Amino acid sequence: MGSSRLAMRSALGLFFLLFVQISLALKFDIAAGKGERCIRNFVLKDQLVVVTAIVSGERGDGQMVNMHIKDSMGNDHGRPKDVIGETRQAFTSAGDTTFDVCFENTLVSRRGISNPHRSIELDVDIGADARDWSNIQAQEKLKPIETDLRRIEEIVAEVVSEMEYLRAREQKLRDTNESTNERVKWFAFGTMGMLVGLGVWQVIYLRAYFRSKHLI
């Protein structure tokens, strides 16, 4: 009974991972001399990010791929130059922010290439996905099922944190919207009051003017 329940929990855990544990994995070509191409993602504060890129080609083919990882807070997280094969960059986010992984393929010489380009495989792991669970399992002497459950626990905690962040952001936007509506309402009342006051003043002025001319 206990073993079947454990197996069921393991199956549910793996099923959950299929839907929740989604890392960004892309494969694309980047032509030489066409400018920078960036992939954007979002990360919460203090989350580990591991960026793995596999770049095709070989040195001396007249192309040079440079990589740049930066976030919207102005932080640089790596600028590998002339990337060939697999390269990996890891960093921990300083805050809730978006970050860009950018590639630029520079043509340094033609060498008879008609359509110079490089193929790039990009894998971005964030949070629990970025941790080395094989190493954790070996160090803490965990069973596979315990490792899976630990991983699920961390992923669920990250999902909860992200939902809390979205809820707080929604509340902030709602408060800003309500504050703006309140200001617009009072501005409209003030404008109407000014128009009414201006109309009354015009009536009084015209009445006094016509009386001075003995027209009324």
From Swiss-Prot:
Keywords: Endoplasmic reticulum, ER-Golgi transport, Golgi apparatus, Membrane, Protein transport, Signal, Transmembrane, Transmembrane helix, Transport. Residues 207-216 are cytoplasmic. It is found in: Endoplasmic reticulum membrane; Golgi apparatus membrane. GO terms for cellular component: COPII-coated ER to Golgi transport vesicle; endoplasmic reticulum; endoplasmic reticulum membrane; endoplasmic reticulum-Golgi intermediate compartment; Golgi apparatus; Golgi membrane. It comes from the Eukaryota. The chain crosses the membrane at residues 186-206. SMART domains: EMP24_GP25L. It holds the Pfam family EMP24_GP25L. Residues 1-25 form the signal peptide. It is a single-pass type I membrane protein. InterPro entries: Emp24-like (IPR015720), GOLD_dom (IPR009038). Residues 36-126 form the GOLD domain. GO terms for biological process: endoplasmic reticulum to Golgi vesicle-mediated transport; Golgi organization; intracellular protein transport. Belongs to the EMP24/GP25L family. Constituent of COPII-coated endoplasmic reticulum-derived transport vesicles. Required for efficient transport of a subset of secretory proteins to the Golgi. Facilitates retrograde transport from the Golgi to the endoplasmic reticulum. This is Endoplasmic reticulum vesicle protein 25. The gene is erv25.
